[in-house]
From Swiss-Prot:
Cell wall formation. This is UDP-N-acetylenolpyruvoylglucosamine reductase. The lineage of its organism: Bacteria, Pseudomonadati, Pseudomonadota, Gammaproteobacteria, Lysobacterales. GO terms for cellular component: cytosol. It is an enzyme of class 1 (oxidoreductase). The active site is at R172, S245 (proton donor), E342. The gene is murB. GO terms for biological process: cell division; cell wall organization; peptidoglycan biosynthetic process; regulation of cell shape. It comes from Xanthomonas oryzae pv. oryzae (strain MAFF 311018).
Amino acid sequence: MSDTTQVGWQLSEHAPLRALNTFHVEATARWLLSVHTPEALPQALAAPEIADQPLLVLGSGSNVLLAGDPPGCVLCFENRDTAIIAHHADHAIVRAGAGVNWHALVLYSLQQGLSGLENLALIPGTVGACPIQNIGAYGAQVGDFIHVVEAFDRHHQQFVRLDAAACALGYRDSVFKQQPERYLIVAVEFNLPLLCELRLDYAGIREELASMGAELARAADVAQAVINIRQRKLPDPDVLGNAGSFFKNPLLPNEQIAALQASFTDMPVYPGEHAGLGKLSAAWLIEQCGWKGRREGDAGVSPEHALVLVNYGTASGAQLLDFARRIAESVRERYSVILEPEPRIIGAHW
């Protein structure tokens, strides 16, 4: 393996990726570009070895399934600076580099007396990845607090600042997901209130707060409740390879949901993000089809949470992908509902 090191970036050849994805599957990058200072990005991308190569950005690798070796170059941002850049009477603007660990940012915001991100505690990944999927959990989504996304526009070869509207944030969607070849996120600015109405819609959070003796909850209490729940329900990727929730919760027209409920009266339904749509529980659908806790070789579904696909040891990305496809097919056959994966599939098609 040969390395090229310049000010602000490093390029490595034939780099193993097992430690850079939370499924812990084996894969190799032809080139691995590590960028420490975003200002060096244009120079790094012009390196002759990778100038015309496809580019895959990996944060902590918590939202990808490497079903094969990625083509071209893998890019990792190593800028991990966090700071409050503006104070106001009722809110503050926090800027975090793309390489900052997401949960570390949540804890930082709480330590600074800021709220808004507490429901998103312990989500694996980095700040640079959070706008791409518009990450969300327990009734909250990061898009509600994004002020500006700083990115390098590869089409125009310049750095740009995109406000929340320009990011086109939707349910697990954004302009960055729609145009993956265009923008490279280098930092995100968040508009975080000093006091925010707590989102306690999920019964599990209310029950956890009660067990903590925190009926008069603060944002930090909600974060701790979420941490407790996630640690009980979701396996630690450092111990058991996984990427959190593997499937999106399906959004369907209310008419289709009503027809399903007529046949499956115990099917849980939640409000959708838009009028006329409802949301089904992908976990419920998968469990009803008998997949929860099922294991084939080293590929399986967590016995604690039906949405979590796990690698018990040496399953390949291709084996995990085949397992996930069969889960989705069984749900389609029984309910006529199409499940879509949350992680990006690399090296194969869904």
